[in-house]
Amino acid sequence: MANYTAADVKKLREMTGSGMMDCKKALVEAEGDFDKAIEILRIQGAKDVGKRAERSASEGLIAVSGNTMIEVNAETDFVAKNQEFIDFANKVAQAADAANANSREELEAVEVDGVKAVDALQELSAKIGEKLELKRAVTLEGDKVAVYLHQRSADLPPAVGVLVAYEGENEEAARAAAMQVAALKASFLSTDDIPAETVAKEREIAEATAREEGKPEKALPNIIEGRLKGYFKDVVLLEQPSVTESKKTVKQVMDEAGVKLTGFVRYELGQA
């Protein structure tokens, strides 16, 4: 005869976050001793962390606090939308912002409720039963930063996050620029930010492609410049057609709004 009740199992699940069958097994092993059952589950959870370390964690969320953005990963979207996981990520983001965290190492070192984030993460991993990972963090310099977070579906936390640093008073225009980055994935703010070797390589590709197409020699310079401009429109934020006013570039829209963009960063869940 079982020396525990359904209420005991329910209470143990609520206290530890462990699965129902794990709670039942722990109560059986502990012969109904509640405190001992908790200890058994904690030990088992710690053992399982090592096994989980080999598994892939590609779900999760993007969280933002102030000028800082972080990515925290889990194995499944079921855990990604777990409120405890979301609350943990938001707490870490706040701590990362206070510390101006700018790398994975700095992110892991921030403290949450008096505990290093990486240690708090392992405790949560043992409780939830999935591999969790503090993947990356960035702090964008600037007195003013516009934020845009995009959810892939209404029941999931943000999977894309953008920070845009700007000067000026039009926050709405700056946020529109952040939405632009989320949608069109610009790689550079201006053409001046593109490395010279990258421009040279694109020029080589444009010329080689034009020659393969049999374009007239005299027309090559104009064709190459035209294709370079097309490349810039794809990868340079200020050169892209605005998603809000398609006949204007982002630079034109920002100039009209009295906004100067000074930097941006884009995170997408599961990408480097």
From Swiss-Prot:
Region named Involved in Mg(2+) ion dislocation from EF-Tu: 76-79
Organism: Corynebacterium urealyticum (strain ATCC 43042 / DSM 7109)
Record's keyword terms, sorted: Cytoplasm, Elongation factor, Protein biosynthesis
CDD domains in the record: UBA_EF-Ts
Protein name in the entry: Elongation factor Ts
Gene3D superfamilies: 1.10.286.20, DNA helicase RuvA subunit, C-terminal domain, Elongation factor Ts, dimerisation domain
GO cellular component, one term: cytoplasm
Lineage top rank: taxon: Bacteria
